[in-house]
Design a protein with these regions (language model features):
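Active-site C-terminal subdomain of aminotransferase-like
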Residues: 1-74, 87
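Amphipathic, non-transmembrane alpha-helical secondary structure
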Residues: 49, 157-164, 168
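Surface-exposed helix-capping loop/turn segments at secondary-structure junctions
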Residues: 54-56, 78-84, 171-172
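Conserved C-terminal alpha-helix-loop-beta "cap" of PLP-dependent enzymes
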Residues: 76, 80-154, 158
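A common structural junction motif
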Residues: 124-131, 163-171
Length: 172
């Protein structure tokens, strides 16, 4: 019945149970649907209180800028990656996305290239290094690193060698 019923009004993403006319089983298997649960309200309140305690919005912006700089400096210095957004004026300082490039990467088939970010993500997740940083499903194959004010620059700096390690492992 879910597959045959189309409401006349738009549904919030949280309540959409089908995609492309078929039931979306991924949402029942733990896939992220990018809609916050109402159960997360207390987490938002705690985060807002924490943000206020460190200096409010100006401090959070400063932290996000510092975090993005750590990752962006690495991207700009690393020949096998590039920022997914070419125009620096259009880049975000929170969800920094980058794609792979270079001689080895370019020698791969299109399908193999598309698999590289996901393989790196899975390798690092298996090591307990990071979670939920694979690129968006509908974006070009990429990695997406959270650089918002809620993380420490040192943690982003610690992640970078792991990405380098995983990329090197894939080339073996």
């Amino acid at each position: 019945r879910i597959e045959s019923y189309d409401p006349e009004w738009p549904l919030p993403k949280l309540f959409r149970l089908k995609k492309g006319g078929k039931i979306n089983t991924a949402i029942f298997e733990g896939a992220t649907i990018n809609t916050p649960s109402m159960l997360a309200t207390e987490d938002y309140i705690a985060a807002l209180e924490w943000g206020k305690s460190i200096g409010g919005l100006p401090a959070l912006i400063e932290r996000a800028n510092a975090n993005a700089k750590v990752l962006t400096d690495w991207i700009e210095a690393t020949p096998y990656v590039r920022n997914m957004v070419d125009d620096p004026a259009k880049r975000t300082n929170t969800g920094v996305c980058f794609v792979f490039q270079g001689e080895w990467f370019d020698s791969l088939s299109e399908d193999e290239q598309a698999a590289v970010p996901g393989k790196i993500y899975k390798m690092l997740e298996a090591e307990g290094v990071g979670y939920d940083f694979n690129g968006y499903r509908d974006a070009p194959p990429s990695l997406r690193i959270w650089c918002g004010g809620t993380v420490e620059s040192e943690d982003i700096a610690r992640l970078i060698p792991w990405i380098e390690w995983a990329f090197a492992e894939l080339q073996k």
